[in-house]
Amino acid sequence: MPEASSPFPDGIVLGFDVGTRRIGVAVGSAWGAGARAVAVIDVHGVAVDWNALDRVKRNWLPVGLVVGDPLTLEGHDQPIRKQAHAFACQLRERYRLPVVLVDERSSSVEAASRFAGARAAGYKRRRDADTLDAIAAAVILERWLADPMQATSLP
């Protein structure tokens, strides 16, 4: 559950894993511990499919948004970080909701591990691999749910 100084009230929260071709989206509740992958949004060049994101937002009615902050394992910038921060600012401006950044180091590795486990158990197939971005978003959102005070606010 978010602490009193969390920027979000209790309610639904969306998490995002920003990539150069796709943005993974996950949903969780600010009073719960788990998150679920719900969508993969296409990115064409630098243009996000805002119509698809608008539908996700309308379906879930979030009270806040969590965006993965891509850093190298050593904690340094990497090229996608600028795009992720720009996307976070666009989300805040478009939806007028609080947005925070969460360190996403190794989230893709954890997502791949979860996907492999689901495949081995027969829950996922190779053709479902495009959901990896949404699974990574769920990992990012779960990190925020576990410790919301580790998030960074947008400037």
Swiss-Prot record:
Keyword Nuclease listed: yes
GO CC annotation terms, alphabetical: cytosol
GO molecular function, one term: nuclease activity
Subcellular localization: Cytoplasm
EC number: 3.1.-.-
SUPFAM superfamilies associated with the record: Ribonuclease H-like
Main location: cytoplasm
CDD domains recorded: YqgF (cd16964)
Record's keyword terms, sorted: Cytoplasm, Hydrolase, Nuclease, Ribosome biogenesis
Domain of life the protein comes from: Bacteria
GO BP terms in the entry: rRNA 5'-end processing
InterPro entries per record: RNaseH-like_sf (IPR012337), YqgF (IPR005227), YqgF/RNaseH-like_dom (IPR006641), YqgF/RNaseH-like_dom_sf (IPR037027)
Function: Could be a nuclease involved in processing of the 5'-end of pre-16S rRNA.
Similarity annotation: Belongs to the YqgF nuclease family.
Protein name as annotated: Putative pre-16S rRNA nuclease
Originating species: Xylella fastidiosa (strain M12)
